[in-house]
């Protein structure tokens, strides 16, 4: 992907999530069971980063663990909502490609449904390397992305954008799509960028960033809805 276009998509993603912030919070007020289960990787006394925290809902399952929680997101409106919902937590607007933290700062980093919104292999790798930079040696990256290949409606989008790419009508990379966000009345508010990772593609990318992959599996509300990966920063 052309880097100029990738930068445009990063800016577009920020604008899109500001546009849908209230709708997003309304439809994601609860914490699904698969995310609750990922909470088991955080322990008392640890510094934990919620990278791409959105409305802060991960904090709901971590707040009683006596951890030092930090939440960051590119959307100012989502951070405002998170601060209103959880005034005791630390939230700030920040870019996950250039984190405002020192090296070896965190014990754990949660990346829940974020990496698939990062355009281009260059920026995806930069995101992971930046996570590695701020993780302590031996620290864990807990990662989830959507498994578009197991979602029927999403698979149709893959076919559509693959066709557009083949006939030179798309600046996106192969396996990239735009997913419409609709209001309750059915109006399209935003067309969000996603990269449709495969299970092995995700694992290979995480390894390329210098992590050791401990576990990689499919799961979710329906079988195969998401891809999960636990990676360790080498000692």
Label each PLM-derived region with a short phrase.
Residues 1-49, 54-98, 122, 142-235:
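Class I (Rossmann-like) S-adenosyl-L-methionine-dependent methyltransferase catalytic domain
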Residues 125-137:
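A short glycine-rich, Lys/Arg-flanked "PGG" loop and its adjoining helix->strand segment in the class I
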Residues 99-101, 118:
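Helix-loop segment at the mouth of the active site in Rossmann-fold oxidoreductases
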């Amino acid at each position: 992907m052309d880097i100029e276009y990738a930068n445009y998509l990063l800016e577009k993603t920020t604008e899109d999530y500001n546009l849908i912030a209230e709708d997003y919070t309304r439809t994601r007020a609860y914490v699904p069971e698969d995310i609750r289960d990922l909470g088991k990787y955080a322990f008392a006394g640890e510094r934990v980063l919620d990278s791409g925290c959105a409305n802060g809902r991960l904090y709901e399952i971590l707040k009683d663990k006596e951890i030092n929680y930090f939440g960051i997101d590119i959307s100012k409106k989502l951070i405002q909502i998170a601060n209103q919902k959880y005034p005791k937590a630390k939230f700030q607007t920040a870019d996950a490609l250039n984190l405002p933290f020192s090296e070896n700062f965190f014990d754990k980093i949660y990346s829940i449904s974020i990496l698939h919104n990062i355009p281009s292999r260059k920026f995806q790798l930069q995101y992971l390397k930046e996570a590695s930079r701020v993780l302590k040696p031996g620290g864990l990256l807990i990662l989830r992305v959507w498994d578009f290949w197991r979602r029927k409606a999403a698979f149709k989008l893959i076919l559509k954008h693959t066709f557009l790419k083949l006939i030179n009508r798309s600046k996106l990379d192969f396996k990239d799509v735009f997913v419409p966000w609709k209001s309750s009345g059915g109006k399209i508010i935003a067309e969000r960028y996603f990269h449709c990772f495969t299970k092995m593609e995700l694992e290979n990318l995480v390894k390329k960033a210098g992590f050791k992959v401990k576990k990689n599996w499919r799961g979710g509300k329906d079988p195969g809805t998401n891809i999960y990966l636990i990676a360790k920063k080498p000692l």
